[in-house]
Amino acid sequence: YQLAIVVDDARQGVTDVVRGNDLLSSAARQQAIATALGLDSPRWWHLPLVRGEDGRRLAKRHGDTRISSFRAAGVPTERVIGLLASWCGVGDQTDPQPMDAAEFAATVEISTIPTDDAVLTARNIQWLTDC
């Protein structure tokens, strides 16, 4: 798997890889493989995970938390982006504000995103769906 990822990324010219911090240990293995093969390595960004209030990674046990489900329920995109922005350190985490994609891109810097995992709370879900 690790070899395939490294070769595939190199063939596609991947320069940046953004993934969850649960895959941080893969970066060292992939770096070693790329070096051994004489390939350039991408920059890796390992972001915090989103967890449920029980501290566990989001899963079916937390209900349907897929973006597509929120979209189907009529949740405006700006609310989802606003919640993500609050987890990324924009504004008050306890009081997210709707935000469009352009504002998110202009405001959020990947290097300043908090390293602690985000927690999807019942209050967050209520805020998303109260529109």
Each predicted region: which residue ranges?
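Active-site cores that bind ATP or allylic diphosphates and position pyrophosphate for catalysis
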Residues: Y1-A59, R66-R71, T121-C131
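Non-catalytic terminal extensions that flank enzyme cores
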Residues: R56-L58, D64-C131
